[in-house]
Amino acid sequence: MKNINPNRTQAWKHLKQHFDDMKSTSINDLFNQDKYRFAHFSKTFNNEILVDYSKNLITNETIIKLISLAIECDLIEAISDMFHGEKINCSEDRAVLHIALRNIKNTPILVDGFNVMPQINAVLNKMKQFCNRVIQGNWTGYTDKIITDIVNIGIGGSNLGPYMVTEALKPYRNHLNMHFVSNIDGTHIFETLKNLNPENTLFVIASKTFTTQETMTNALSARNWFCKATSDAQHISKHFIALSTNTIAVRKFGIDPSENMFKFWDWVGGRYSLWSAIGLPIMLSVGVSNFELLLTGAHDMDIHFYSTPLHENLPVILALIGIWYNNFFQVETEAIFPYDQYMHRFTAYLQQVNMESNGKCVDRNGCPITYQTGPIIWGEPGTNGQHSFYQLLHQGTKMVPCDFIAPAISHNPISDHHEKLISNFFAQTKALAFGNTHLTSMQKYIQSKKNYKHEQCIVPFKLCKGNNPSNSILVKKITPYTLGALIALYEHKIFTQGIIFNIYTFDQWGVELGKQLADSILPELKYESMISKNHDSSTYGLIHCYKSWCG
């Protein structure tokens, strides 16, 4: 994989010139110039997902120049390298193979000359057997009661992905009650456990290293709660399982690794791991067949990404449009608005995948970067956000490109709720793009009011300038298949941007510094020792105040 500084490419120079030509263009002008603009700037995926990117400040020339940038940055070779098991995560000397986890066609994928598919299939089969036993009531607790509650203890990728998917697929859930504990704040584990019965509760401890501070602190508290109720640590084997690679630590905890540990590999990044054993809570929640459909949807998007020409390639198109705004319009954020309540954790999930992946300031050569890399990702489900921050989107001074996502078919077609929801989706993308600045329509509005003079005075305050870009992603229905495809769509968008940014998307060294400092500060809070004089005055003052208040 080549290391190419994007802003030294010819394509980047051409895009800067093109931006100078485009910056005074309006979305309204673009639609007026092309009555078939929707047809020209929208694509479907397997007749299940429609991506409409027509409400963007782009032309055919923009797309051509952006694709030239992708080609000059050697995106096609980078895609091939990932799919063929090359160690593209060079800072950690690892392959990047979440795509292998959903390789349902079982095509051989080699890492260091070894086909990884047999070991993937072995873990997947072990997951299926275990989940079927729990779901069917054949796995019982220490008093022979069936399991009714699953508590997943993990953080980051070991929590966000499984939690998001189980929430998004609630219509497919079985009888098991799912709980997710991530925060080291004792309130999280306390509030989760206080209404549970240890006799029918199963704990899933999800940690690759089995040393993650937050996860193991919560896991030990859960084990203490369980042992206090049962008075016998031997019963742990029926109520605790591990998703990990650390056999020694898992056994020390009291879990039998040969039976109750589900492994994964160093080429699976945490934020890309819901397809692996980390996805076991998903399989427990929705069953084996639905988990397989989730994998199938992602795999089909993988094939689309790998084999489709760049100008037809949905992840590539979305990535390039994002770079257009991020690096030429200099916007700093992207908003994601799922108009589906089941998808309420989708933005938080993508926030981690994107910001932990592409929030980097050093390029693949180890040099400081002089251009913007990953954007800030934020958002809320619609229509809640409309009564919160959409005011800024419509009349503020910042450009915020938005992705609107909604299903055409609702799982809960109550009265006309869904039609009203979708009408808001369509209305918001239209209002953001076109505003209400058309003189004739404003005059008609003013003339329709009784207090004509007053309305004339407040016209400037009611004007919405429009020209705010958005993508509309309409899904036929949120199913395991379409959700898998949608997640993979964004994964590959992020990968594409990372290649063009010339960064290592799959490491996260910035997470480590805070962990190290917390480990050094912890003894100063727990014991009567003196506070280190090596702290800055702010940290010293905070620790001193904390200790004085806590006695």
Swiss-Prot record:
Keywords: Cytoplasm, Gluconeogenesis, Glycolysis, Isomerase. Gene3D superfamilies: 1.10.1390.10, Glucose-6-phosphate isomerase like protein, domain 1. It comes from Blochmanniella pennsylvanica (strain BPEN). The keyword Isomerase applies. Its EC number is 5.3.1.9. The keyword Isomerase applies. InterPro entries: G6P_Isomerase, G6P_Isomerase_C, Phosphoglucose_isomerase_CS, SIS_dom_sf, SIS_PGI_1, SIS_PGI_2. The active site is at E356 (proton donor), H387, K515. GO terms for molecular function: carbohydrate derivative binding; glucose-6-phosphate isomerase activity; monosaccharide binding. Signal peptide: none annotated. It catalyses: alpha-D-glucose 6-phosphate = beta-D-fructose 6-phosphate. Pathway: Carbohydrate biosynthesis; gluconeogenesis; Carbohydrate degradation; glycolysis; D-glyceraldehyde 3-phosphate and glycerone phosphate from D-glucose: step 2/4. Catalyzes the reversible isomerization of glucose-6-phosphate to fructose-6-phosphate. It is an enzyme of class 5 (isomerase). Belongs to the GPI family. One of its GO terms (cellular component) is cytosol. The lineage of its organism: Bacteria, Pseudomonadati, Pseudomonadota, Gammaproteobacteria, Enterobacterales. PROSITE patterns: P_GLUCOSE_ISOMERASE_1, P_GLUCOSE_ISOMERASE_2, P_GLUCOSE_ISOMERASE_3. It comes from the Bacteria. One of its GO terms (biological process) is glucose 6-phosphate metabolic process. HAMAP family: G6P_isomerase. It is found in: Cytoplasm. This is Glucose-6-phosphate isomerase.
